[in-house]
Amino acid sequence: MKPLIHFAHANGVPSKVYQKLFDQLKDQYDIIYVAEIGTDKRYPITHGWTYLVDQIIDSIVQQSQGRKVIGLGHSLGSVLTLMAAYRRPELFSQVIMLDPPFIIGKASFAFHLA
């Protein structure tokens, strides 16, 4: 059985846009994904992204058939995936974050002031 990837896309870039990436991975991995983050009224966009994290978790639970996933996310999707893994670690074998929007070090102080 191939490892299972759950993919979460970047802000405003639906998962289908990543089809060429999925095509490159499909020989070695099974791939599931959340189609569109932030457009489903059951998962409103709120401070702290709580409901968007719920959307990631629900997507995994509904599609994984009980298998642990490699959580793969791009930008916003990577942060939501990390938050989902923190909340429900039993769903994940690992997390891979592509281009996470983290600002660390001295520069982060200026963003906290903004």
Go through each PLM region and give its residues.
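Conserved HGGG/HGGXW glycine-rich cap/lid loop of the alpha/beta-hydrolase fold
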Residues: 2-42
